[in-house]
A protein has these predicted regions:
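Charged, alpha-helix-enriched surfaces in structured cytosolic catalytic cores
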Residues: 23-26, 41, 74, 101, ...
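Structural signal for conserved beta-strand scaffold positions within catalytic alpha/beta enzyme cores
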Residues: 7-9, 58-60, 115, 148-150
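Cytosolic-facing regulatory segments adjacent to core modules
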Residues: 41-50, 60-94, 124
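Fold-independent oxyanion-binding glycine-rich loops
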Residues: 9-11, 61-62, 96-97
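Conserved catalytic-core segment of NTP-binding enzymes
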Residues: 78-165
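Phosphate-binding loop that captures ATP/GTP phosphates
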Residues: 3-58
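Conserved nucleotide-binding/hydrolysis micro-motifs of P-loop NTPases
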Residues: 12-14, 63-66, 120-121
């Protein structure tokens, strides 16, 4: 609430018409294009792409899934570094799906990883597979960055609990 946050949805099917209005205009693929240009016009270009939902700024997600698959880890890193250094945003909130190439490297860049979960047998099996994958890939240290959000709760309550956990871990509680 007290800082500038930019939400970027990096999922293959982000929910146009539901979460996001189906509108024409520039989206995350355009922001990536401008980031690749290596000039100082990224933030100027970005101002026309930023939309607002309540107190949250966001750029429309990539509309065509195949565009998402072509973005390299280095391009994501470059974009995130440039946004951190050149824009007004102190925090980037990334909604990452598994359609991203080299997901683990992208997660390595994050200070915190919020993981939605539920208590049903299928959700538990997915979490077990996630833990197994971290172990096989020798990325168990990512567990220390995880904050889980119980999706069976009221969303406001779940997010409030996640924020409380985050503050506790950062020594702000």
């Amino acid at each position: 609430e007290n800082e500038n946050v930019l939400y970027l949805n990096i999922e293959a099917y982000a929910g146009f018409g539901g979460y996001f209005p189906w509108e024409e205009g520039q989206d995350l693929s355009h922001l990536l294009y401008y980031s690749r240009q290596e000039n100082d016009m990224l933030c100027a270009r970005m101002t026309s792409m930023v939309h607002r939902m309540g107190s949250l700024d966001y750029v429309l997600p990539i509309r065509v899934t195949t565009d998402l698959h072509t973005v390299t880890t280095e391009e994501w890193q470059n974009l995130f570094q440039r946004l951190s250094k050149e824009s007004i945003y102190e925090t980037l909130l990334l909604d990452i799906g598994d359609s991203v190439a080299d997901l683990m490297s992208l997660l390595e860049m994050c200070d915190w990883i919020f993981i939605p979960y539920a208590e049903d047998v299928y959700a538990k099996a997915k979490m077990e597979q996630w833990q197994y994958m971290l172990e096989v890939l020798k990325r168990q240290h990512l567990n220390q960055s995880e904050i889980r959000i119980n999706m069976e709760q009221n969303m406001r309550q779940a997010v409030a609990e996640a924020i409380t956990e985050l503050r506790k871990r950062e020594g702000m509680s």
